[in-house]
Structures are given as C-alpha cells and as structure tokens.
Amino acid sequence: MDSRASGTASNGETKPVYPVMEKEEEEGTLERGHWNNKMEFVLSVAGEIIGLGNVWRFPYLCYKNGGGAFFIPYLVFLFTCGVPVFLLETALGQYTSQGGVTAWRKICPIFEGIGYASQMIVILLNVYYIIVLAWALFYLFSSFTIDLPWGGCHHEWNTEHCVEFQKTNGSLNGTSENATSPVIEFWERRVLKISDGIQHLGALRWELALCLLLAWVICYFCIWKGVKSTGKVVYFTATFPYLMLVVLLIRGVTLPGAAQGIQFYLYPNLTRLWDPQVWMDAGTQIFFSFAICLGCLTALGSYNKYHNNCYRDCLALCFLNSGTSFVAGFAIFSILGFMSQEQGVPISEVAESGPGLAFIAYPRAVVMLPFSPLWACCFFFMVVLLGLDSQFVCVESLVTALVDMYPRVFRKKNRREVLILGVSVVSFLVGLVMLTEGGMYVFQLFDYYAASGMCLLFVAIFESLCVAWVYGARRFYDNIEDMIGYRPWPLIKYCWLFLTPAVCTATFLFSLIKYTPLTYNKKYTYPWWGDALGWLLALSSMVCIPAWSLYRLGTLKGPFREPPPRSLQRIRQLMCPAEDLPQRNPAGPSAPATPRTSLLRLTELESHC
C-alpha cells in the first residue's frame, strides 16, 4: 500500500517520505503507479466529466428553465457545490494516494461508508450507462448507407401510421391522429422493439447485445493496464469530441433558422427564477456533469504526484466543463432552430432532452441536411466517444477502490487485468436485461433512481460534513497547502463548512417533496413494484453511510460498558486520521519531522483524538 510520511530533502524542501513496504515487496506486490505527466491526468478527468450530459441535458435545461436566466442558479451551485466538492475529492485522492473507499478510511474511519456509497452508485452506473453506447454504436453502424434508415416509411418495421414531414410547410403526408414519424418508429420498432411494459421483458435484442459486447471490449482495453493505458487513450477520446463538436457547431450556425434556435436557448426569462424546480434542476445538473460523489475524481487524483497543483487543475477543469456545456447549447439549438423552421412548428415541439435528443431529435434533423449520412456518422461517433471515456473512468474508479482495499490480492502480476475482466463480464451480463424488448423500462429505472441527483446530494452532504467538521477544514487546507505550496481561495473552506452542506440538504429535501413517480414517454405508468425496485436501487447507496457508522460503533469492544471518558475516547478513535498519512512540518523546512498531533489545533485535538 502506498503509504507516505513527510521528511526534509537536502535542498530544504519538505517532501513526502515513502516508508519501505517490506511485507508487500516480499510478496511481489506491484507499485501503485502514477500519471506520466499532468496532461494525462487533466485529459482523463476532462474525459470523465465532459460527457453526454453536456450535450443532451444542459442545453435543454437552459431552454426549459428560462434561457439565460438559468445561468444564475447554475453559477450559484457551481461556486457553492461544484467547485468545492470537485476540489475536495481530487485533493483527497492526491493527499492519501488511495481510491474511493480507503481514502475515507484513512481520514475518518467512521465515515468509510461514504466510499461504499459512492462505489455502489458507480456499480449501478457501470451497468446502465454503457447501454447508451450500445445504442449509439447501432446508430453509427446504421449510418454507413446512402439513405439513412430512419429517413423514410418504406421499411419493414414501419406501420401504416408512419408519415413524413414536408420540409417546407410542416404538414404531414396524411391525416391520421395516430401518425408517427419514421425517426420514432426506427427508434422504438427497429432499435428497441419496445414492449408494452416492464412486466413483459420479451426477447433479447441480439444486435444491441453485440454492440454492448463491443463497447465493453473497447472499454476493457482502454484501462486494462491501469494509468499506463488510460493515460494514452484519453489523448484521443477526450480531445476528438471537441473537434466533432466544433464541426457540428459550425454546420449548425450556418443553417437557416439557427438564430431562432439560439434565441430560444439564451433569451432570459427572469420570472422562472421564482420556480424552485429551476434551482433543483441547476443543482442536479452540477452533480451530474461534474462526476462528483462517484469516487472517480478521488481515484484519478490518487495517481497524481504529491506536489501536483490540484487546485489549479480543478479550477481549470470546472470552467472547461461548464464552458463546454454552454458551447454545446449553440450546436444543439442551432440545429433545432433549423428543424423548427423547416417543419414550420414551434421549437418546443422539437426540443428534447436525454436519449430523446440523441436518438430522435438530432437524427430527424440530420435527415434534412445535405450529405446526411456523413453528419450522422460525425454525431454518433461523438456520442460514442463522449460516453466511452466517462464509462471506462467509472470502471477504473471501481477497480482502483477494490485494488486499494485488497492490495496483497490484486496488486500482483495480471491480477488487476483479471479483476477488470470480471467487472466487465458481470456488468455486461446484468446489462443484457436492458437490451430486451422491455429493457428500456429497466434502463429508465436505473437512470431515474440508481444514480439520481438525490443519491449524489446525499453523499455530498456527508462528504462536506466529514472533511469540514470531523477531519477539520483548516487541517485539510493545511494538507492542500503542503501539496501545492499555498492555500486555496478561503471561500472554498467556508463552502465546505456551511454553504455546501446547507445547499445540498435544501435541494435534497426539496427533491423528496417534489418527487413524482416515474413514467415512460409521459404515457406509461410503472407498476407499484417497479417504483419499489427503483427506491431499492436508490437506497442501496444511501444506506451505506449510516449503516457503516453503526457497524463500526457496534463492533467497538466494550465501549459502552466502560466509564464515559474512556468510551468517548474509543469512539473518537474512529474519527482519527491514519498515522501514515503525509505530515506537514509546521516548524519550517529545516526542522525535523514532527508528530502528526502537533499539527492539530486545540479544538481539533479535543474533538478527534
């Protein structure tokens, strides 16, 4: 295990000292590894946080919640929750050199459940997020043709209700009240072959299963050698989507009607700020798009060198992420404005979010463009890459957590590769359920409950409370100062102490109050047991935090049978950081290393150890 203490180098600079790992070396334990350079870390994090949510969720939320006015609550959550928690998790990983579970064990054992909660979310996320890649691959392969298969009603999967929009007047080639478009029929009858409910799963869609298998094979080989392979792959997977986004942006803004679409995207409606739902949407979008509370940032940060300037990296990555979301809105809504003008319908009828944008709205727009197969290939290749690096970083997060929990088992030759293979195979097999004819209903359950904003908010509350109030915000600032050479902006510390837990708690409670049962396509209502299954998925992660704390308290040997002073002292031991964490030398670089307790202020000594 990569344990570190501090010492003084010959040039007077305080450096972490790595103790000799005699037992592990005797047993042939491999080194944990580091990024070869800063760029690998930056691109890996960028690939993780800049994903599908930037393209198919943020622009729609802007349009839905008051256009430019939505940026007000978005920026509030960005600076009170997004940036502080982003820095907290990244710095925690860099400071402890541990994954998403053991990092929390080292700074506060009683809150180790935070790590288990985040990994439970990642386990569920790994199963269903990659399904989107399977769909995107299916569309990508279907785009290698002269005429796109969702462009007309003459295919075997089309029904008599299939009608096409006239490009000029928006009228339908028919008068049926049940009329559907070829894009929707391709999605529901060719790709999904969707059944009438979750109770009828039906047959497995073998074509999608092969696409899912291909996605998992690509994901496996992207991370099978750890940071050595991941650091190289992200040079392509994290940068090429930007090229595609720029190409689509240039094409979009040059289309007729683009200005109208961009106006709908940005025109501010300040009255929407009085709606609490707007603020909840802004908060959940921050947590979705910044990949916080998943353990991914902790895992990626743990491969940094000790003196890497994680504070500067975090600020740059946060603003890059938000900027990408903003620019993606221009690319998407310029296309939607073009659709609105060509079909002669309001933009509200073509604006969609989530899979509806990627697999219905945008494919419909592509059909109207010259050289439509080319633009379809560009778009779906971008979707695949946006989802791919987010997926394999999540798998890397889980694998890193397991390896750090059991280093003597997995940190040996070929053991890590076998572990990744096992995770991939199990996740693939479970994911096949979502590729049945009723699999879309299962997918929505996972998406709505398993990795919902509610779960992420719950974890964020305890993360900020643990670091700020139990471990000590000032002490964590001391740790960051020891790593980067200066103290971050003081506002971030006060966010950890007050703003982040308060804002997250308020948003969490509001999401409970405003909870509405899940529906599909605003028509199908899930049975009671479907909602119950969804809540079990949500609680599977949230329950880890209190359950672990109660377990640790319950396994203390006799604390409640001893006098109160001694029992409290034993409980405080569960709140004490590990002794082998890097130690800051407060006396100056020329002074000898000091015990860890000399770093604590009086109040921290009394409340911790």
UniProtKB/Swiss-Prot annotation:
It comes from the Eukaryota. Disulfide bonds join 153-162. It is found in: Cell membrane; Basolateral cell membrane. Keywords: Cell membrane, Disulfide bond, Glycoprotein, Membrane, Neurotransmitter transport, Phosphoprotein, Symport, Transmembrane, Transmembrane helix, Transport. It catalyses: 4-aminobutanoate(out) + chloride(out) + 2 Na(+)(out) = 4-aminobutanoate(in) + chloride(in) + 2 Na(+)(in); taurine(out) + chloride(out) + 2 Na(+)(out) = taurine(in) + chloride(in) + 2 Na(+)(in); beta-alanine(out) + chloride(out) + 2 Na(+)(out) = beta-alanine(in) + chloride(in) + 2 Na(+)(in); hypotaurine(out) + chloride(out) + 2 Na(+)(out) = hypotaurine(in) + chloride(in) + 2 Na(+)(in). The modification Phosphoserine is found at residue 598. It is a multi-pass membrane protein. SUPFAM superfamilies: SNF-like. One of its GO terms (cellular component) is cell projection. It holds the Pfam family SNF. Glycans are attached at residues 169, 173, 269. The chain crosses the membrane at residues 41-61, 68-88, 121-141, 207-227, 233-253, 282-302, 319-339, 366-386, 418-438, 453-473, 490-510, 528-548. One of its GO terms (molecular function) is gamma-aminobutyric acid:sodium:chloride symporter activity. Residues 1-13 have a biased composition (Polar residues). Mediates sodium- and chloride-dependent transport of gamma-aminobutyric acid (GABA). Can also mediate transport of beta-alanine, taurine and hypotaurine. NCBIfam families: Na_transp (NF037979). Belongs to the sodium:neurotransmitter symporter (SNF) (TC 2.A.22) family. SLC6A13 subfamily. This is Sodium- and chloride-dependent GABA transporter 2. The gene is SLC6A13.
